[in-house]
Amino acid sequence: MSRVYNFSAGPAVLPESVLQEAAAEMMDYRGTGMSVMEMSHRSKAYQTIIDEAEADLRTLMGVPENYKVLFMQGGASQQFAAVPMNLMKNKVADYIITGQWAKKAWQEAQMYGQANAVASSADKTFSYIPDCSDLPISENADYVYICENNTIYGTKFKELPNTKGKDLVADVSSCFLSEPVDVTKYGMLYGGVQKNIGPAGVVIAVIREDLITEDVLPGTPTMLRYKTHADNGSMYNTPPAYGIYICGKVFKWLLNNGGLEEMKAYNEKKAAVLYDFLDASELFQGTVVKKDRSLMNVPFVTGNADLDAKFVKAATEAGIVNLKGHRSVGGMRASIYNAMPIEGVEKLVQFMEKFEKENR
């Protein structure tokens, strides 16, 4: 069977060359006589893998020396608790609610202190990013929290909020490495890798060193303390070894393809193909305010739930898969992450044109 065009929101498409490399090394990783899946995480061979992965990520993102890179487990959702446990010194934090994942993080933080919702776009089904230029930031807030790209609703912060001097914490799961980033604008950014970097099971955090302290909330488990992982080079316990290995290959793939500047240009080109069609279509409509559109996740609808279902079924039969929208919103969603080739987006648009002609 030939490979499909996979528009899944995550786990998601990976670069074919990375999959081919991993397949070639599956039985014997570089003369070790074993797979990385079988390798001791304490071996020299694996230490080289994780060291190279960190070095390449630092190069890609321009991570300053005073920031730590942590490879952890538990996915982004575990960080909803870990962030307040580690950073909520005054037991106050401000959250900007632009979708389900920011809302879940905010709700989790309420278990540990005063979590204030200082802005929200819930009034219009999270179809836009609120004005964050002059927010009522709490005087004693430990941090301001955002989900930078909203996977479900297809919105993206084009400008970071004015945090009035407070540290910014960002969940970047679905826009990780999609464009250049100024790490110094964040106290911490983190993301699950299963959308834009690798297989499920790894979460990467980039966090400024002064935020990594022993002074965490009482009862914070050892495994949720950032200092545990920082002091042990992400090797306190057995890490998600194979997942990190694949992430490392994706980092090299990005470097070999011009880095994040080139990736951003390619992503803009891909997204324009789909958004231009949606803007001209008489059947399909995008659901997001134009200025806030994500380059990674593109939700759209026909306005008829039965027709939406018919489209998703027909697309699947044509080898264009995982277009069904998130269960909480319905409709369709095309996730066009770094590894989605522009040919896949063009094939999707061609299919949408055909479907529109047949279903007017």
Q: Model-found features: residue ranges?
A:
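A glycine-/small-polar-enriched, mobile loop at the entrance of the PLP active site in fold-type I
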Residues: 3-54
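Conserved N-terminal alpha-helix of the aminotransferase class I/II PLP-enzyme fold
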Residues: 33-79, 86, 100, 108
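PLP-dependent aminotransferase-like
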Residues: 77-144
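Active-site phosphate-binding strand-loop segment of PLP-dependent enzymes
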Residues: 10, 109, 120-176
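Conserved PLP-binding catalytic core of the aspartate aminotransferase-like
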Residues: 284-315
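Active-site C-terminal subdomain of aminotransferase-like
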Residues: 15, 193-275, 289, 358-360
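Conserved active-site segment immediately N-terminal to the catalytic lysine
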Residues: 169, 183-194, 203
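PLP-dependent enzyme catalytic core of the Aspartate aminotransferase-like
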Residues: 2-4, 317, 330-360
